[in-house]
């Protein structure tokens, strides 16, 4: 198959004041530690689930088949049935829409589906499809069974989206020729193809577009044992000696996200090479991740800043999103799409009709006294 593409460790015994005092020393040490290939990388971006420059091109780490794909068991079962049925009928797959937080493998699943079907895989993003001619350029060259993958599909311009409706439903491309009263529509037949869309904001899709997908599937956060398998697989592919305990230490701090797990693994690998003998043990992994202020629950200094501001300035909440963004200096969309999903997942933050509220579990993790059940992944 061809692919064509357009702060502090957060120890529970420490309070917020002590963690703040360690910040400058941490930043100095991170700057001085030269990591192979990524000198000057921003350590605060380690836990952001969005792809960093160059990461999306690392095809060697991507699974090629459903059998190689780790995790998402229910999704794989649904897709294996769809693939078998399409093969039996000798038909292309129905259109598919994948949604969920970033970094969970939506692009990878799309590429795996194309490989399983023996199809050509065309990949683009909605922001790159600014005008109808952009999407038309893809549609007219698709052959029967080819897969067109559109990432961030919720960001499609309206005129481009409307061009997709007849293409998805009737496999035709409606082109308007001329302007004003002399304008006319010419329809071009298209080969039967499969459109796969990916989005982190399924609620932002219009109903007409969403309803044209035959499969709408959600990708969930990964369990720690699944991330351990992913880390060990990456270690084998990169030929890095790694203990299962070292892989587990990385996995439990990876926020349920494979992209973050692989990113943290590479930083731990660099640390082991510079500060040790190249072998990743539990002790080496913990020391490396503590250097980057990724604590045992997978929180970094920005996560802790968000929670601490809610506690110290607003008594734990409730606080509206815009207010929280103004006080912390973070973009509201970044808070909502990057940081909140994981904090909600582990039970450290709650959304209420009146705003965001810090939970007792988060208070205890930050070093404040609180009586509550243990967090979900403790």
Curated annotation (Swiss-Prot):
- Bilayer-crossing residues are none
BP GO terms, sorted: DNA recombination; DNA repair
Region entry Head domain (RuvB-H), spans: 296-378
Recorded catalytic reaction(s): these are: ATP + H2O = ADP + phosphate + H(+)
Q: What is this protein called?
A: Holliday junction branch migration complex subunit RuvB
Q: What is known of its domains?
A: Has 3 domains, the large (RuvB-L) and small ATPase (RuvB-S) domains and the C-terminal head (RuvB-H) domain. The head domain binds DNA, while the ATPase domains jointly bind ATP, ADP or are empty depending on the state of the subunit in the translocation cycle. During a single DNA translocation step the structure of each domain remains the same, but their relative positions change.
Lineage here is: Bacteria, Bacillati, Cyanobacteriota, Cyanophyceae, Synechococcales
What EC number(s) has UniProt assigned to this enzyme? 3.6.4.-
Q: Which gene encodes it?
A: ruvB
Name the segments for region: Disordered.
1-63
Principal subcellular localisation of the protein: cytoplasm
Question: Localized where?
Answer: Cytoplasm
Which Pfam family, any one, appears in the UniProt record?
Answer: AAA_lid_4
- Region of interest: Small ATPAse domain (RuvB-S): 223-293
Positions contributing to Mg(2+) binding: 107
Detail which positions bind ATP. Answer: 61-62, 103, 106-108, 169-171, 212, 222, 259
An annotated GO cellular component? Holliday junction resolvase complex
How this chain assembles, per its entry, is:
Homohexamer. Forms an RuvA(8)-RuvB(12)-Holliday junction (HJ) complex. HJ DNA is sandwiched between 2 RuvA tetramers; dsDNA enters through RuvA and exits via RuvB. An RuvB hexamer assembles on each DNA strand where it exits the tetramer. Each RuvB hexamer is contacted by two RuvA subunits (via domain III) on 2 adjacent RuvB subunits; this complex drives branch migration. In the full resolvosome a probable DNA-RuvA(4)-RuvB(12)-RuvC(2) complex forms which resolves the HJ.
């Amino acid at each position: 198959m061809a692919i064509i593409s357009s702060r502090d460790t957060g120890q529970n015994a420490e309070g917020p004041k002590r963690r703040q005092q360690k910040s400058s020393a941490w930043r100095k040490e991170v700057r001085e530690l030269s990591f192979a290939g990524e000198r000057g990388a921003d350590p605060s971006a380690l836990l952001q689930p969005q792809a960093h420059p160059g990461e999306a091109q690392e095809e060697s780490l991507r699974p090629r088949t459903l059998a190689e794909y780790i995790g998402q068991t229910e999704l794989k079962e649904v897709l294996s049935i769809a693939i078998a049925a399409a093969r039996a009928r000798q038909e292309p797959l129905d259109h598919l829409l994948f949604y969920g937080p970033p970094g969970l493998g939506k692009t990878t699943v799309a590429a795996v589906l194309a490989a399983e079907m023996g199809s050509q895989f065309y990949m683009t993003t909605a922001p790159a499809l600014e005008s109808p001619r952009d999407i038309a350029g893809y549609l007219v060259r698709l052959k029967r069974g080819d897969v067109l993958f559109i990432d961030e599909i919720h960001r499609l311009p309206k005129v481009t989206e409307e061009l997709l409706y007849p293409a998805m439903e009737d496999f035709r491309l409606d082109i308007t020729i001329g302007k004003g009263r002399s304008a006319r529509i010419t329809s071009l037949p298209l080969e039967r193809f499969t459109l796969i869309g990916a989005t982190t904001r399924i609620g932002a899709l219009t109903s007409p577009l969403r309803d044209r997908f035959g499969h709408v599937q959600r990708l969930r956060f990964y369990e720690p044992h699944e991330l351990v398998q992913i880390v060990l697989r990456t270690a084998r592919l990169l030929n890095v000696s790694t203990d299962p305990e070292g892989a587990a230490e990385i996995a439990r701090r990876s926020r349920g996200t494979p992209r973050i797990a692989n990113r943290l693994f590479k930083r731990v690998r660099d640390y082991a090479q510079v500060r040790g003998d190249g072998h990743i043990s539990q002790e080496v992994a913990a020391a490396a991740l503590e250097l980057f202020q990724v604590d045992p629950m997978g929180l970094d200094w920005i996560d802790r800043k968000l929670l601490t501001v809610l506690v110290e300035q607003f008594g734990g909440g409730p606080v509206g999103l815009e207010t929280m963004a103004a006080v912390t200096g973070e973009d509201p969309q970044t808070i909502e799409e990057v940081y909140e999903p994981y904090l909600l997942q582990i039970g450290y933050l709650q959304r209420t009709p009146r705003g965001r509220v810090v939970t007792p579990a988060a208070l205890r993790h930050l070093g404040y006294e609180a009586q509550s059940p243990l967090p979900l992944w403790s």
